Each structure stands twice: as structure tokens, then as C-alpha cells.
Amino acid sequence: MADGNGTQETQDQAPAINAMVQYTKDFSFENPNAPRSLGPQEKAPNIAIQVHVNAQQLAESDFEVNIVLEGSAGEGANTLFKFELDYAGMFRLLNISPNDMHPVVMIECPRLLFPFARQIIADAVRSGGFPPLYIDPIDFAALYRKRLDEVAASAPQLKS
């Protein structure tokens, strides 16, 4: 029941991001040079990581959001390990304006998924015989802005 100043109504209309379910869609870990690669290394390996965010609308307020993390340690014939993780969640977004919907889906939802994806990779790398790889936090807002800039740059330009 609402009190006299409308507090309950305000709470009912507050924006909300509900994580309905989270899941691994696809995962692979390769240790192509084991057991040779498991010994002491002369220097720290080169680690490369790529991040992709994808989303699709499932219903009016429901979205599936995926983080795809691909990475490797070492180079060429000296590859220590490779991984690819497609980690997803289904989110229900409530009371979010249409103008804010896309940024929320592409920034806030991946931000909620990331710690779980990071732990899956750390555990797999450790299980592969290496020290765990803890991926640095990702600035999904910067990633989103970069993607918008890339789309704008690739759009055909109208000539006047």
C-alpha cells in the first residue's frame, strides 16, 4: 500500500535489470603443447584477449546478452593455451526509457555477466596447469562507444 506521498508508486516505476538466468553457451580451452608448455617459462607470455558483446531481443522487455571472450597466451609454435568463451544471460529490463534501452543492454548487462565469465576462464586456465588468468575489468561503456563510432564510420556518407 502506498503512503501519502507516493513512495510506493515511485518504487514500482524505478528502472530495474533482472538477470533471469546465466549460462555458458560455448567454451573451449586448448593446451596444444602440453606437457612441454607446462614447465617454467623464461619470460612472461604475451597474452591477447578479444571481447565481443552481442544481444538479441527475445520479448518486449527480455534480452539475451552474450559476452564472447577469446584469448591466447604465447605466440605461434610457443602457444601455451587458447580459450574461447561465449557466456550469456537473459535479462528482463523494466521501466527503462526507449532511449536508454540499447546502452543498458550493451553496457550494464555485460557488466553484470563479466565477473562470472572471468572466473570460468581463470578456473579453466588453472585446470590447464597454468597460474589462473584473471582478466582485468572491462570498460563496457568505452567498448560501446567504440562500436558506435565504428558503425558511424562505416555508414555510407550522403553527398550534398
UniProtKB/Swiss-Prot annotation:
<dbReference type="GO" id="GO:0006457">
    <property type="term" value="P:protein folding"/>
</dbReference>
<keyword id="KW-0811">Translocation</keyword>
<dbReference type="InterPro" id="IPR035958">
    <property type="entry name" value="SecB-like_sf"/>
</dbReference>
<dbReference type="GO" id="GO:0051082">
    <property type="term" value="F:unfolded protein binding"/>
</dbReference>
<protein>
    <recommendedName>
        <fullName>Protein-export protein SecB</fullName>
    </recommendedName>
</protein>
<dbReference type="GO" id="GO:0015031">
    <property type="term" value="P:protein transport"/>
</dbReference>
<comment type="function">
    <text>One of the proteins required for the normal export of preproteins out of the cell cytoplasm. It is a molecular chaperone that binds to a subset of precursor proteins, maintaining them in a translocation-competent state. It also specifically binds to its receptor SecA.</text>
</comment>
<comment type="similarity">
    <text>Belongs to the SecB family.</text>
</comment>
<keyword id="KW-0653">Protein transport</keyword>
<keyword id="KW-0143">Chaperone</keyword>
<dbReference type="Pfam" id="PF02556">
    <property type="entry name" value="SecB"/>
</dbReference>
<comment type="subunit">
    <text>Homotetramer, a dimer of dimers. One homotetramer interacts with 1 SecA dimer.</text>
</comment>
<dbReference type="GO" id="GO:0051262">
    <property type="term" value="P:protein tetramerization"/>
</dbReference>
<keyword id="KW-0813">Transport</keyword>
<dbReference type="GO" id="GO:0005737">
    <property type="term" value="C:cytoplasm"/>
</dbReference>
<keyword id="KW-0963">Cytoplasm</keyword>
<dbReference type="InterPro" id="IPR003708">
    <property type="entry name" value="SecB"/>
</dbReference>
